[in-house]
Amino acid sequence: DVPPAAVTLLVVPGRDWSGDDLDWLRDLSARGHPLAGHGWRHRCDPPRTLHHRLHSLFISRDVAEHLSLDGAGIAALIQDCHRWFVEHGLTPSPLYVPPAWALGRIEPEALAALPFRYFETLGGVYDARERRFIRLPLVGFEADTAWRAWSLNLFNRANLAMALMAGRSLRVSIHPQDLYYKLGGQVEAWVRRLDRTLDYPALA
């Protein structure tokens, strides 16, 4: 069995959380699941830059909300995210995961001043306190179209090969609807391939 500490649950504060929902989150936290901040709305404003347009087209659709913001806006969003946990009696993980792993343009000095220590991207995890990037391969299953299924299969195989060759840990990303998408039948098999698990602070 995978220990709760190895399964980090991502929380989007700006959603419509009821009192029962918050009690459920507190119960999950009490059972040992880390709760990580995950943006604010999980929705972005219309793309204004070519980079954001291409990112939306090929990767993130309308969820990469950091890419709509400048550095100050990104920092404010992350601060608000952390504050929401505290105000609702929840213990935030030291990890922050931007929607679609798209952190946006923000300076290392600004990240170091924020209450989260670790920031996850497609390529790995950035430790803002130590100012170092920990490269970690990633596999995912959010494939609701044939194109996404094909490209994610290639992505997953390449990242598994990278993990094996470099002797690195492999991150496994599972979204709530992934089991019902085109790669849903692969999720359990990938999880079974894991011979041990780590929590994020253990990577530092």
Which residues does each PLM region occupy?
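Hydrophobic faces of well-ordered beta-strands that scaffold small-molecule active sites
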Residues: 7-9, 35-38, 94-96, 118-121, ...
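Acidic-and-aromatic substrate-binding clefts and catalytic sites of carbohydrate-active enzymes
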Residues: 10-21, 43-47, 97-106, 146-153, ...
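Catalytic domains of cell-wall/extracellular-matrix polysaccharide-remodeling enzymes
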Residues: 67-142, 180-185
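C-terminal domain-boundary segment and adjacent tail
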Residues: 2, 7-8, 118-119, 169, ...
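Active-site beta->alpha N-cap acidic-glycine motif
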Residues: 1-34, 93
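Short, solvent-exposed beta-strand-terminating loops
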Residues: 28, 33-52
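A conserved mid-domain beta-alpha-beta active-site/ligand-binding segment of alpha/beta enzyme cores
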Residues: 132-182
